[in-house]
């Protein structure tokens, strides 16, 4: 667990993005993939990041300070159909600007749901991340929802659909599966 992790601020538009020299580890993934639960697991706090039952809860870029040394940054999920076209466009611009203009991103954690085949949006995100030359790791969330054999099968599907060259780490916020590996 990351000690002394606390919420710092939210950015709903480009003007609100945090200007900092601190390194940033960024979470990306589709809506309802478990980014907020992932943050809560890292911090060993149940309510640090607000977890929603409906997709699209996070509509801002949220910064979490870790030991006053670096930030975990939670980006809004993509693929949420209940956003208006204007909201989708504004969110897309915000995310693009954040990643394109930010020289302090040290790593990206790309979260996918292990229970489901990656979507076209996941594939687009994977290709986009690959083009950015920023180190990233694929985290397959919600691993506790399926058995070990199914986890292995589904990780192969994820690898095949994304054409992923990276290792995929199965993760569960419920039983903290592989939390120690991810923290390192």
Language-model features, listed with the residues they occupy:
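Amphipathic alpha-helical transducer elements in NTP-driven molecular machines
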Residues: 88-92, 119, 176-179
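Conserved nucleotide-binding/hydrolysis micro-motifs of P-loop NTPases
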Residues: 57, 70, 77-80, 115-117, ...
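Canonical P-loop GTPase G-domain recognition
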Residues: 2-16, 144-184
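Conserved C-terminal guanine-recognition region of P-loop GTPase G domains, centered on the G4
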Residues: 93-167
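Conserved G1/Walker A P-loop phosphate-binding module
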Residues: 1-86
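Short, well-ordered secondary-structure micro-motifs
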Residues: 18, 62, 83-84, 119-123, ...
């Amino acid at each position: 667990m990351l000690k002394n992790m606390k919420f710092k601020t939210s950015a709903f538009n480009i003007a609100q993005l945090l200007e900092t020299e601190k390194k940033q580890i960024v979470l990306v993934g589709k809506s309802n993939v478990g980014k907020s639960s992932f943050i809560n697991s890292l911090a060993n706090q149940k309510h640090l990041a607000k977890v929603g039952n409906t997709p699209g809860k996070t509509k801002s870029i949220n910064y979490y300070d870790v030991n006053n040394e670096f930030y975990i940054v939670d980006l809004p999920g993509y693929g949420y159909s209940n956003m208006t076209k204007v909201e989708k466009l504004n969110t897309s611009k915000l995310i693009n600007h954040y990643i394109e203009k930010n020289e302090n991103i040290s790593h990206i954690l790309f979260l996918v749901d292990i229970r489901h085949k990656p979507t076209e949006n996941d594939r687009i995100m994977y290709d986009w991340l690959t083009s950015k030359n920023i180190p990233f790791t694929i985290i397959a969330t919600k691993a506790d929802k399926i058995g070990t054999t199914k986890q292995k099968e589904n990780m192969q599907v994820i690898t095949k659909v994304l054409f992923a060259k990276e290792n995929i780490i199965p993760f569960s916020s419920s039983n903290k599966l592989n939390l120690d590996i991810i923290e390192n």
